[in-house]
Amino acid sequence: NSSGEDDLILVLDVEASTSHSVARISDGEVFLRQNDKSVRLSREQILALEYDKGQRVFEDELAEDSSMEDIDHDVLDRYKEILGTNASDEQVLRSRRFMRNGKLTVAGALLFAQDPSAMLPQARVRVLRYDGVKMKTGEHLNITKERSFHGPLPKVIQDAYTLISSMLREFQFLGPDGKFQTVPEYPEFAWFEGLVNAVTHRDYAFRGDYVRVSMFDDRLEIVSPGALPNIVTIDNMRTTRYSRNPRIARTLSEFGWVRELNEGVQRIYTEMQNSLLNDPVYSEPGKVKVQLTLENNIVARTIRRSEALEDQASPEVISSLSEYELAAVRLAFANGKV
């Protein structure tokens, strides 16, 4: 130091609490430490904190104004077949903790109600296709296709899968054997697992937003409302198991949709690598949502296609074609037919 003496440095190592409970002071108030300040939380913020810590589980809350009349019996009948039971609808819902006191729980409504969005407006999936690589608004709005899906989660997942599959492109290139080979824009497992994870693990207590799938020319983005749950981080999500909505996750697993979160994420990486595409990118914009971005490498694929075309036609022939003739030849070459 300035006196020429050694400084004494104290290092305080405070381990994170293993308790998942929210501590209240004598008057019932709850404070949250943010940087160097203690901030008093509102009732809504306290509930959100309790959900995040797992002290309360939003999917187990009751969906007000719900009843057996809201049930989609086709979906519930499928579930009863999976369980191999002949019990009544109400018995099944009660025994699996999807109904209490004649009302559906949030999980019960999301999984089995005809229209969960009537009780939970945030419960929907929206799929959008954009022309280009950026989202534009106003007079430059570039949405070419848009559809929202409401209904019980098993139906939403199936219907969204069908639409997205129909909107994805295929790429063709000339293989080393001289034959055309077709590859999908993205490996199916990667985008579908991303969709299922978003629907399953999103924060349904987070109101005002919904699961969103945005398709651009060069990438596909899947946004799930709410930050990552509890102990999961961007860095450890490939190895950490945790479910914010365990009842929903278990039931969708019984329907054949859901894997363990870390197992599915790890395979998304593997599938993208096997398709010679960039690794998936996970991010938490504003710490209020989780975004998965899959890049389709369209530029490199276009270059490879052009190079393959040039291998089949001389530069003189290509240069002699008009702009429209060249576009027609490229289209026929890409599709493998005229």
Question: What are the functions of these language-model segments?
Answer:
Residues L12, L110, L292:
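A residue-level signal for conserved active-site and pocket-lining positions in enzyme catalytic cores
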Residues R33-R207, M215-D218, G226-R241, G264, ...:
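Active-site helix-to-loop segments that bind/position phosphate- or nucleotide-bearing substrates
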Residues V329, N335-V338:
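Short acidic, hydrophobic short linear motifs in intrinsically disordered regions
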Residues F189, R241-N274:
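Glycine-rich phosphate-binding loop
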Residues E260-V317:
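Long, low-complexity, charged/polar intrinsically disordered regions in eukaryotic proteins
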Residues V11, R126, Y210-R212, V281-Y282:
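Short, surface-exposed charged micro-motifs
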